[in-house]
Amino acid sequence: MDLPAEALDWLAVWRDVRGLVLAGDLGLPRRLTAAGHTLFALTDDLTLAGRLGSLEKVTPLVARPEAIPADPCQFEVAFAHQNLHRFDLTQALPQLARVLRPGGCLSASYLVRDDTVPWVRRLSALLRRYDPMAMRGDYGHASLEVLAASKYFSDVEERAFRVWQRIGRDDLLSLVTSQPLAANLAPEQLGQLLGQVGELYDGAVRPGESLRLPFQLLGVRAWVDHAELTAPVQPPDSALSIPL
């Protein structure tokens, strides 16, 4: 699902940034370079690194954020979308702080389903009759709280963007069939469940239209504080270095 342009601009902060992206796929790097930004894309997946290298204005770095192979103060913005929780943040956050320029920020985001819409609440309640853990997605966005509490990022801004995905009747039935609970149901039970889901859809949608599945993009801009680094970052006029 594409990020809204407004959200992308907010996460990027400025135009034409020199950025570091913790790459999980090609999606975010493509969007950022299309917006005019120049990127270094960090991944430990050699196959993905090769694909990233084919993109214009993207330089792949084969590494993890716990040990970034870059001099200090190299980037204005570091980006992490849907993957910050996959890393050891006790090591990754000071590394990211080290390679950010003074005044730079780490922009992290997660796309999570919004269960406050009435038809989605009814769907959740229906599925939980069959499996109490249904639709309790763990997206990893608790890592944003870890970032907000980090001493390496003293000022944190938060913002949420609403994102809608159109979903047809067959799409919703396929979505339910793909849930783990479906594999544990007898054919008769699954048929009964799908019938109830179909009735729910028909009762919620307007004639000739499709439903919209709501999501929220949770965004954080965490501004770097170099004062907390063990080895203070002091970029001289002619070069960038960390005095030991």
What residue ranges belong to the model's regions?
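Class I SAM-dependent methyltransferase SAM/SAH-binding core
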Residues: 18-68
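Conserved catalytic/acceptor-binding region of the Class I
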Residues: 97, 101-167
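A short acidic, Gly/Pro-enriched loop at the edge of an enzyme's catalytic core
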Residues: 66-78
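Conserved Class I S-adenosyl-L-methionine
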Residues: 148-244
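A short, conserved alpha-helix within the catalytic core of class I
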Residues: 86-96
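A short beta-strand submotif of the Rossmann-like class I SAM-dependent methyltransferase core
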Residues: 77-81, 89
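A generic alpha-to-beta junction signature in SAM-dependent methyltransferases
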Residues: 13-15, 33, 99-100
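Conserved alpha-helix/loop element of class I SAM-dependent methyltransferases that forms part
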Residues: 1-18, 25-27
